[in-house]
């Protein structure tokens, strides 16, 4: 209990003294990036700073880069995962923060489809409208059952994976019931956090990270910052919807100007996620409009790895 309070106090100081580019950066510093160690090196040095109670801006700025792309992760998402894991007595790798609320579930379903393993998805509160389970079955071919329960204690383990979806005001208190393999903590404004619960779930982590890397993005720097503020009991810095809309309009105008078109623009979190959405949207369209026709995907041999995926 004392260590948890010390951890939260330390995070308060980190948020107060962190380098400004942690929140605003769009490109990582590769001069302090070691690809072979990457996030491990970042967390090891963060551990050392925590143990020695060092949180100066200069010390935090010298922490090595954990990822080579912002969409894969960044200092604030890494610290969020590290903090949640520390509060729960878990390893940092067991916690994965997503910008999306649905992608954590898809990452487990994808792994289980390849492993020919069934999945039970439980929830107690009303789910966000983004969860279209019928589409997941029809378009992706995922095999799972969805069950609503009153309490987390009503979840029963079976010879497969159990996923529990929870909505909360904070990521601080997680109910890791032993019958749950994966807890997905949802925040409608910030994204979600997936926790791999128990030793048997740890071998899913590379596959979960793979989906976040190739088909989605990590929780964004501003949202990870807000989540950390919630963790330490602070009121999250207000996010201006007006500013967000202005930025969105600016991007759309740029697209219209560059392409010399006036067609509708749909924006995504990153290039790979847009490609992914286009591909799965085409499959969904084909299934609905040409149900008796086979679907074939042609991938050129020199296609970029992420697109191949």
Residue locations for each model-derived region?
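Conserved N-terminal alpha-helix of the aminotransferase class I/II PLP-enzyme fold
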Residues: 2-106, 110-309
